[in-house]
């Protein structure tokens, strides 16, 4: 992961970037409508909140789709019971793909599936991964970020393209919130 290793230091302010998403509505459950993408500014959206942001290299990819995100969605209430106000899953995929994947995972309004537009947020954290050798290009890395009022509480990543899920897993996140 390139970038400044101090960017994710505890107490640092998060990057102020734009993210895209499609707000969940019950109409999306049918799969017959796709919703309308909108954007939010990270510092505005997360001001005054304790938030868990989980980044993945791509929706519907093996580790993300089979091991990482389904347990997170199923256990989101455990995070909320520990004082977490909001949970976001971010990736470089477009808002339509992220919304469809959130719908597939039955996330409804419990977890927001958002697009890290131009990888700006993850790049500012030094948390991207080059998957060009697999024809995916540069992607958001697999990481978990816990913030409180826009300040970093904890950052943990699963380094490289190892296919291993550990530091960004729901089990690990629950020990840190």
From Swiss-Prot:
EC number: 1.11.1.24
Keyword 4Fe-4S (UniProt): no
Broad enzyme group: oxidoreductase
Gene3D superfamilies: Glutaredoxin (3.40.30.10)
Catalytic activity: a hydroperoxide + [thioredoxin]-dithiol = an alcohol + [thioredoxin]-disulfide + H2O
Domain of life: Eukaryota
Microbody targeting signal, short sequence motif: residues: 175-177
Annotated Thioredoxin domain residues: 8-177
InterPro entries: PRX5-like, Redoxin, Thioredoxin-like_sf, Thioredoxin_domain
Entry keywords, A to Z: Allergen, Antioxidant, Disulfide bond, Oxidoreductase, Peroxidase, Redox-active center
Active site residues of this protein: 64
UniProt keyword Oxidoreductase, yes or no: yes
Subunit and partners: Homodimer; disulfide-linked, upon oxidation.
Function, as annotated: Thiol-specific peroxidase that catalyzes the reduction of hydrogen peroxide and organic hydroperoxides to water and alcohols, respectively. Plays a role in cell protection against oxidative stress by detoxifying peroxides and as sensor of hydrogen peroxide-mediated signaling events.
Annotated family: Belongs to the peroxiredoxin family. Prx5 subfamily.
The protein's name in its UniProt record: Putative peroxiredoxin
Organism encoding this protein: Malassezia furfur (Pityriasis versicolor infection agent)
Lineage: Eukaryota, Fungi, Dikarya, Basidiomycota, Ustilaginomycotina
């Amino acid at each position: 992961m390139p970038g400044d290793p101090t960017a994710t230091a505890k107490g640092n302010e998060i990057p102020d970037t734009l993210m895209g998403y499609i707000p969940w509505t019950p109409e999306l459950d049918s799969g017959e409508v796709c919703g309308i993408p909108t954007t939010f500014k990270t510092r505005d959206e997360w001001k005054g909140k304790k938030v868990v942001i989980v980044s993945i290299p791509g929706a519907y990819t093996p580790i993300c789709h089979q091991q990482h995100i389904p347990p997170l969605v199923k256990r989101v209430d455990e995070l909320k019971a520990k004082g977490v106000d909001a949970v976001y899953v971010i990736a470089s995929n477009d808002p339509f793909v992220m919304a469809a994947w959130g719908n597939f995972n039955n996330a409804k309004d419990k977890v927001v599936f958002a697009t890290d537009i131009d990888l700006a947020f993850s790049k500012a954290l030094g948390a991207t991964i080059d998957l060009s050798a697999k024809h995916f290009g540069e992607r958001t890395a697999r990481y978990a970020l816990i913030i409180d009022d826009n300040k970093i509480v904890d950052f943990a990543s699963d380094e490289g393209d190892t296919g291993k899920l550990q530091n960004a897993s729901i089990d690990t996140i629950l020990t840190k919130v």
